[in-house]
Regions:
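Extended amphipathic coiled-coil helices
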Residues: 1-168
C-alpha cells in the first residue's frame, strides 16, 4: 500500500504571453535583479513579478521542488505540469534576453565613462583591460541570452531550482 500526498494548489488561469512578459520586464526589471547574477536574479524577478497577477494571485506554482515540477492552470481550468519550467522559459526568454542585454550595455557604458576620468598615461592600459572585461561581459551576456538553447542541460536545472526556491 503506497500513500500519495496530494498537494492542493489554487491558481488563477495562466494567461502569460511573450507580449505581457515584455511589458513586465520593461516596467519592473531593475539593476538589482540583474546584479544578483544569472539564474538567481532572473528567478527572483520571475517569482516577484511574472508568476503573479496584479492582485497578487499566483498563476504558476512549484508543485514538486525535488523533481522541478511546476504547475499552471490553462484556460479550460485544467492543471498542467511544466517540468523544469520549460513552458515558462519559452515565454519569458525573449524579454529576459533583451533586458539583460540592455543592462549589460548600460553597465559597460558606465564603466567606459568612469574609465575616461583617469589620466592619459594610464588610459591605454585601462582601455585594454576594459576591452578584455567587456569581451568577458559580452561572452557572459551571450551565454545568458542564449540560455534557451542551454536550458535543456544545466541552465534550466539552475533556473528551475532557483525558481522553486523562490515560489512558495
Amino acid at each position: 500500500h503506497q500513500t500519495k500526498n496530494k498537494q492542493i494548489i489554487n491558481l488563477a488561469p495562466f494567461d502569460l504571453t511573450q507580449d505581457k512578459a515584455k511589458i513586465i520586464f520593461a516596467n519592473k526589471y531593475t539593476p538589482e535583479y540583474f546584479l544578483q547574477g544569472g539564474m538567481k536574479g532572473l528567478a527572483r524577478f520571475v517569482s516577484d513579478h511574472i508568476v503573479k497577477t496584479d492582485t497578487g494571485e499566483s498563476i504558476y506554482a512549484c508543485y514538486d521542488r525535488s523533481r522541478d515540477v511546476f504547475k499552471y492552470k490553462n484556460e479550460a481550468g485544467e492543471y498542467i505540469n511544466d517540468i523544469k519550467a520549460v513552458r515558462l522559459v519559452e515565454i519569458i526568454h525573449p524579454a529576459a534576453a533583451e533586458h539583460s542585454r540592455a543592462m549589460n550595455d548600460k553597465f559597460h557604458e558606465e564603466y567606459m565613462s568612469a574609465l575616461s576620468e583617469y589620466d592619459e598615461e594610464n588610459i591605454t592600459n585601462k582601455i585594454t583591460q576594459n576591452e578584455l572585461d567587456c569581451k568577458e561581459m559580452k561572452a557572459t551576456q551571450s551565454r545568458e541570452s542564449n540560455f534557451l538553447h542551454k536550458y535543456l542541460n544545466t541552465e534550466l536545472d539552475s533556473f528551475s531550482k532557483e525558481l522553486g526556491n523562490n515560489i512558495k
